[in-house]
From Swiss-Prot:
Domain of life (superkingdom): Bacteria
Organism expressing this protein natively: Stutzerimonas stutzeri (strain A1501)
Keyword Transferase assigned: yes
Alphabetized Gene3D superfamilies for the sequence: Thymidylate synthase/dCMP hydroxymethylase domain
Functional summary from the UniProt entry: Catalyzes the reductive methylation of 2'-deoxyuridine-5'-monophosphate (dUMP) to 2'-deoxythymidine-5'-monophosphate (dTMP) while utilizing 5,10-methylenetetrahydrofolate (mTHF) as the methyl donor and reductant in the reaction, yielding dihydrofolate (DHF) as a by-product. This enzymatic reaction provides an intracellular de novo source of dTMP, an essential precursor for DNA biosynthesis.
Protein's UniProt name: Thymidylate synthase
Family annotation (Pfam families): Thymidylat_synt
HAMAP family tied to this protein: Thymidy_synth_bact (MF_00008)
Principal place of residence: cytoplasm
InterPro entries the UniProt entry points to: Thymidate_synth/dCMP_Mease, Thymidate_synth/dCMP_Mease_dom, Thymidate_synth/dCMP_Mease_sf, Thymidylate_synthase, Thymidylate_synthase_AS
CDD domains linked to this entry: TS_Pyrimidine_HMase
Length: 264
């Protein structure tokens, strides 16, 4: 995961100090890209231990179209707790936009189901896109989508994915986002009878929070370790049928976890 450390180093060297919504302050650059060949291993950061359980459960939660944190809490995942209301609701966030984007005629659009159908029917399409950024509903969301749009691309029997992340919390958020969309790519590839290709991460406002600098500098002193392998249950051919038990991470070795505060 040298690519990730290079991003962190780039922001430490070239970032501009900016105020932000949380009042914490950030060091930020605009526009950055990282590429990960999924044949070389699963891109889970090794220079600090990452909580894969949270990544998998959150992705499954998105794919079910869920916007209440009940499922997450039942599975020991607390990453959305700070934004939920007293009933656990988050408003029309990722899962709602992915699976139930409201159409003008009162019906809803299942972007994920449409995406799968299009990959199978017309893999050369340039419209293999899912958007979570719905301007009409942004104000109703507990937190507007940071990872706002992703596109798939099929070539030579391989499926690649590019994510556009408008707001990138480099220390805490980005390692999760890379792993989550890399995993989604593996899952979609399996159910569409394709091989995984590349995951490409494109960031807009890429920032380190002012209270994450010490942690980032510590992480930059660590040498990346070999990437692990992610194994999926080969029997699963329906994207919405995947369960937590269908994933096995093999060979994950990482440096110790580095604690850092979340900016809310």
């Amino acid at each position: 995961m040298k690519q990730y450390l290079d991003l962190m180093r780039h922001v430490r060297e070239h970032g501009t100090f900016k105020s932000d919504r949380t009042g914490t302050g950030t060091y930020s650059v605009f526009g950055y890209q990282m590429r990960f060949d999924l044949a070389e291993g699963f891109p889970l950061v090794t220079t600090k231990k990452c909580h894969l359980k949270s990544i998998i459960h959150e992705l499954l939660w998105f794919l079910q179209g869920d916007t209440n944190i009940k499922y997450l809490k039942e599975n020991g995942v607390r990453i959305w707790d700070e934004w939920a209301d007293e009933n656990g609701e988050l408003g029309p966030v990722y899962g709602y936009q992915w699976r139930s984007w409201p159409a003008p005629n009162g019906e809803s659009i299942d972007q994920i189901a449409n995406l799968l159908a299009m990959i199978k029917k017309n893999p050369d399409s340039r419209r293999l896109i899912v958007s979570a950024w719905n301007p009409a509903l942004v104000e109703q969301m507990a937190l507007p989508p940071c990872h706002a749009l992703f596109q798939f691309y099929v070539a030579d029997g391989k499926l690649s994915c590019q994510l556009y992340q408008r707001s990138a919390d480099i220390f805490l958020g980005v390692p999760f986002n890379i792993a989550s969309y890399a995993l989604l790519t593996l899952m979609v590839a399996q159910v569409c009878d394709l091989e995984p290709g590349e995951f490409i991460w494109s960031g807009g406002d890429c920032h380190l929070y002012a209270n994450h600098l010490e942690q980032a500098d510590l992480q930059l002193t660590r040498e990346p370790l070999p990437l692990p392998t992610m194994k999926l249950n080969p029997e699963v051919k329906d994207l919405f049928a995947f369960r937590f038990e269908d994933f096995e991470l093999v060979g994950y070795e990482a440096h110790p976890h580095i604690k850092a505060p979340v900016a809310v």
